[in-house]
Regions:
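Generic structural microfeature
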Residues: 81, 221, 279-282
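Long, charged low-complexity terminal regions
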Residues: 487-488, 506-512
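A general secondary-structure junction signal
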Residues: 64-66, 259, 264-266
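Conserved two-metal-ion catalytic palm core of "right-hand" nucleic acid polymerases
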Residues: 1-169, 180-186, 191-194
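Conserved polymerase palm-domain catalytic core
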Residues: 118-223, 227-253, 258-262, 285-475, ...
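Extended charged low-complexity segments that act as oligomerization/scaffolding linkers
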Residues: 117, 265-270
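Short, low-order "capping/linker" segments at domain edges
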Residues: 269-283
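Alpha-helix boundary/capping detector
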Residues: 112-113, 238, 252, 269, ...
Length: 512
């Protein structure tokens, strides 16, 4: 078994356009490899996958809300490309074994370059809309949530499901070796973050879904959320015991106690309304979302260029209006961070600077939205360079805040902005904190040096290249493209490169 050219071509375009996940800054080196995609494809196509040993990933503790966290993983870009190609090439085998799409709503595979791996971006809303309809004919609704699902998935279960889905043996072995590389050899847990992992996680629930269907349950599911529609409270309690037994016997999974609940129809329909993402907090948010939909046609990935939006529509996204909306979310006793993150993603589509001030001023309350805030800031258009400089000053102040100092993910997210926008230039400050910074921060500071043309500073770090970790090496090789032609050629030729991604990146550096 080998990866096909079509799969590899698609994977390169996919990761370049959609990044490797929703939580981390895009790996900038992907663009360089994309320019030399034929070299990467030729190095992988037709080759034994065992030749490509999984590389070190990055793991960070990421906030879910004010008091809970999850561990998120970013795969090495080579592994992201290979895994994406594998799922593109063989993922339909998993999809064909799943229950119908109006029973299991999450992560239905239909790879396209415009939408990514999964077909329906409105699946979450449709799940709750279907739940609302089913509740009208039920006496009780049982709401179940599998506890810590991704971290509890056994690799042996993944292996069995990939076999049943027709994955070639070599592909299965590579996937399992990748999973083990992210868990320090422990045979349990899959990484949270990478797009293709969602389908692998879904594959492990196929036996659970089949068992619930065989038991005659009227249920629907989205990822680890299961809803069962019952005729009585007695039936709901009996079904609860059955599901708990199925999860335990099949995969030693458990239900999350605080989210397990039996609802009456009226109470449940209120919950359904609360769970739908597109539910504006006030009329002003509804008006802004209407403007965005008018220009994007409802496509959550389409951006609106400043030149295409009318002056009157642009003016609606004022600092006063946007700040009021965000403050209204934050004033709630139980802040709806899921909905607030969704709002920031919509703001990123239009790129209006109206949310900058409130976002930076209220970061202590907006921690669970930080990745979305940074993505929003990187999308901002039509402001003067001097304003970017002021934004950079505020970001540097945030780096000194206690809540940022104590969280690697916060620091990574903030520093990544300096490496992607030349106008935020505060490199003189960043260079002073380089030696005392963590490895991941050094990577972003090196990329910031490249962005701000601090070539002489980069040159001073050539001697430490051999001691850099994999992620720093990638960044420094990329940055070496700014050296004079003879210098970068001599530097690149001094070292060996591990794997097709590094090799192609080094060839790109010498070619420009």
């Amino acid at each position: 078994m080998t990866l096909s050219r079509d799969s590899l071509e698609w994977a390169i375009e996919f990761v370049s356009d959609h990044s490797d996940g929703d939580l981390f800054p895009k790996i900038i080196e992907i663009n360089a490899v994309k320019e030399k995609s034929d070299l990467f494809i030729n190095a992988v196509e037709g080759k034994d996958l065992s030749l490509f040993t999984p590389k070190p990933c990055r793991r960070f503790i990421v906030p879910k809300d004010e008091i809970s966290y999850r561990q998120a993983t970013q795969l090495h870009p080579q592994d992201s490309l290979l895994l994406s190609a594998l799922i593109y090439q063989f993922g339909q085998g998993i999809e064909d074994r799943r229950l119908e799409k109006d029973r299991v709503f999450s992560y239905r595979v239909l790879p396209t370059l415009s939408d990514g791996l999964y077909s329906n971006k409105k699946a979450w809303n449709e799940f709750w809309q279907k739940a609302n309809r089913l509740a009208s004919t039920a006496s009780c609704i049982l709401y179940l949530d599998i506890a810590d699902f991704y971290n509890q998935i056994y690799h042996h279960t993944v292996e069995n499901q990939l076999i049943a889905s027709g994955f070639p043996n070599q592909a299965i072995k590579w996937v399992i070796s990748l999973l083990e590389s992210t868990t320090a050899g422990v045979s349990r847990g899959v990484p949270i973050g990478p797009h293709p992992i969602h389908l692998i996680a879904e594959s492990t629930l196929i036996p659970i879904d089949n068992s619930l269907e065989s038991s005659g349950f009227n249920f629907i599911r989205f990822a680890d959320d299961i809803l069962i529609f019952c005729n009585s409270e007695k039936e709901a309690k009996s079904n609860l015991a059955t599901v708990a037994s199925v999860l335990d016997k099949q995969q030693r999974l458990m239900l999350q106690r605080h989210k397990t609940k039996i609802y009456k129809p009226g109470e449940f329909r209120t919950l359904c309304a609360e769970m739908v993402e597109d539910r504006p907090i006030d009329r002003e948010e509804a008006r802004l979302l209407g403007i965005i939909r008018r220009y994007t046609g409802g496509n959550p990935y389409q951006t609106i260029s400043y030149n295409s939006i009318s002056d009157s529509d642009w003016s609606q996204f004022s600092t006063e209006v946007v700040s009021k909306i965000i403050n209204e979310y934050l004033s709630q006793d139980d802040v709806d961070y899921i909905r607030l993150r969704w709002f920031y993603r919509r703001l990123a589509q239009v790129g209006h600077p109206g949310a900058i001030d409130v976002s930076l001023e209220k970061l202590d309350s907006l921690g669970p939205c930080l990745a979305n805030i940074c993505f929003y800031i990187s999308s901002i258009q039509n402001i003067e360079p001097e304003q970017w400089k002021n934004i950079g000053s505020k970001l540097l102040q945030l780096l000194e805040a206690d809540e940022v100092k104590e969280n690697e993910f916060f620091r990574l997210s903030i520093l990544s902005l300096f490496s992607r926008n030349e106008y935020i230039n505060h490199f003189a400050h960043l260079s002073k904190i380089f030696n005392s910074s963590d490895s991941f921060a050094r990577r972003e500071i090196m990329l910031s040096a490249f962005q701000n043309r601090a070539i002489d500073w980069l040159r001073e770090h050539k001697e430490s290249f051999s001691n850099m970790d994999n992620w720093q090496r990638l960044a420094f090789v990329f940055c070496a493209s700014a050296f004079p032609k003879d210098e970068k050629k001599y530097f690149i030729n001094r070292f060996d490169y591990d794997g097709p991604f590094e090799e192609v990146l080094s060839k790109w550096v010498k070619s420009i």
